[in-house]
Swiss-Prot record:
Belongs to the DsrF/TusC family. The keyword tRNA processing applies. HAMAP family: Thiourid_synth_C. The keyword Cytoplasm applies. InterPro entries: DsrEFH-like, Sulphur_relay_DsrE/F-like, Sulphur_relay_TusC, Sulphur_relay_TusC/DsrF. One of its GO terms (cellular component) is cytoplasm. One of its GO terms (biological process) is tRNA processing. Heterohexamer, formed by a dimer of trimers. The hexameric TusBCD complex contains 2 copies each of TusB, TusC and TusD. The TusBCD complex interacts with TusE. This is Protein TusC.
Amino acid sequence: MKRIAFVFSTTPHGTAAGREGLDALLATSALTDELAVFFIADGVFQLLPGQKPDTVLARDYIATFKLLGLYDIEQCWVCAASLRERGLDPQTSFVVEATPLEADALRRELANYDVILRF
């Protein structure tokens, strides 16, 4: 079975990319357990709790990330450099537990996957 990586690199609620990526991730988890989630660039904002998407008439899907554990999705990585560049502390309480990795280590980890889907 191929190993699949889901990379979230866009801000939440500006487009449907984050919501569609999360839907695809949860659906794929029913087919394989060889997957991981990566949050890079503006995708780190997907991890923040307390967002108010209703102010831009968007659906609040961020809380759904909390289901990753129920779906046995345990490999979650976040780019430490992306957090720093956006003024976010790696010790912040995110909606899902994600391990911070520096960019070079994150690239090495991502290289272990056969398929990379970016949202």
